[in-house]
């Protein structure tokens, strides 16, 4: 690079400066700066000598490297480890680490690998949240307690942040210099074990990716790892281990894999009991045993996309923080720390003879001490199972507290609640209710969706409405209904709308609108496949796996859990003729449209019958109730005569089309006429609807 600043004139200026330095007797009082950095005369002389023979960039790099070497020699390699890492063993001695419960096997395996003569580098492999970092902390505690092989009883585990190695390395060679200092620090200490969390980041870290010869962190460490000169503990996930570490065979063989699985529910409860005291001290909240068990049980049931113990600990922490924020209890730890700070300030004020300030500080100390004495733990909040349910509800949107409070009674009455909304389809409602009661009461195998049903019947008889009411009754709102119109899934590429595209196709990284992604975000939902007979056969093939195994693999290889969903398929393929058709006759008719293995996966095939006029009497009441809900927003009450209701039924009854014509009549004859009347009488508070001359009439008050 050509830089006019570093030319012969600049060299002459530097030579003149050097002559002044030699001729002056007051050199010690002069200061010299290069690029804003103060340097000694010797460093300036070295820079001048190199700058005269090299380009500006090379001179700057040489000076930077010399400064780094000098800094490393001054600070020492041991201090460098302290600068960029945390000594977990020392933290264990100081009692700063949480206890590790139920991981003795993994800790023992890690200790055995570390005690090897060569290739003594364990790598903890497990999914996110299973406690890989906690195992390393447990190993540090085991070293302090002496419960490890003799070969590693004096080891110090240093947790290294990879980003700290890269920080400030703007010149070529600076990163390699940091790595060499790190390696030399480990060699000189003779008892240091490095811990890299997210160790897959060492692949390519520090490499320039060009032909300049700059090496990455993993390339520099390989020789030392194979000879056993340094020992490293790594932690990473299964995917990152496969996609990064295993691609480098030379690096893989230098590590020994220690598999970390998700702990059982029983072990997780014991883990929570082990860390309970620290959470109680931090939040000033009591956490009984039943609360710990509820954290585990509810997190397993309602947060299936995450793993234990991480999700259970999060639920416990969030609940305690929520109660602590609402509790008037004094934070004892913070208050005592504040009193200690004030005592120090008071002593300084007395030393400075600022007695008025010291007196004010003493009054504040007395006030805080009185608060501590008066609290005595009597206002300490106590967590309950209901608080855990509220936390799950805030995290997932599922009304867990409502479902748990009186779940048995709700299960008993589910059929009556659905019958009040779905008119004339008692047989269908009862079949659906039985399947849901069986699943929710715990008498199902648990490896399939809550229920899978095929609703068959003519249009307008309540098939879709029953799915909506199920979503409201079970999950609290209509948003829990995922509705897919199968007329949009009739082409051969429709599978990509369900599970996303596979690698190599457009949209592989964008699966936000697929069914699998929606279920992953909302695992508790009702999935409605409307008019299933229009779907492409590949869609039906996918549903076989969902209804049989309760899971589905998306285009990116992620397994999505469908075990907390209700699957409903609807079809109007020639059924619902008003007769009491036997189930075997229904199966015979449906085999004309669907394969037997598809029909055989459903919990029930439900026939919806034609609606008669008696059923429409209840339906018109429901539709008018919806109108009243709208009028309530305007502060208007409504009274509809029986003659008006009979007139609506007569005008809206169509046996073939079901209840939809009645809905249109109510829309046109009731809502529209009330709207017209309101626009002419904006102060109206009550309306009466009756029949005059075979027409509906709206009168207001």
Swiss-Prot record:
Keywords assigned by UniProt, alphabetized: ATP-binding, Chaperone, Nucleotide-binding
Spans annotated as Disordered: 46-78
Biological-process GO terms, alphabetical: cellular response to heat
Location of region: II: 383-575
Entry binding sites for ATP: 126-133, 457-464
Keyword hit for ATP-binding: yes
Renumbered residue ranges of the record's region I: 81-332
GO cellular component: a single term: cytoplasm
Compositional bias segments (type: Polar residues): 46-55
GO molecular function: ATP binding; ATP hydrolysis activity
Domain of life: Bacteria
Amino acid composition bias (Low complexity), ranges on this chain: 56-74
Pfam families associated with the record: AAA, AAA_2, AAA_lid_9, ClpB_D2-small
Matching SMART domains: AAA, ClpB_D2-small
Segments forming domain UVR: 336-371
Family of the protein in this entry: Belongs to the ClpA/ClpB family. ClpL subfamily.
Function field: Required for the development of induced thermotolerance.
PANTHER family: ATP-DEPENDENT CLP PROTEASE, ATP-DEPENDENT CLP PROTEASE ATP-BINDING SUBUNIT CLPL
Descriptive protein name: ATP-dependent Clp protease ATP-binding subunit ClpL
Lineage of the organism: Bacteria, Bacillati, Bacillota, Bacilli, Bacillales
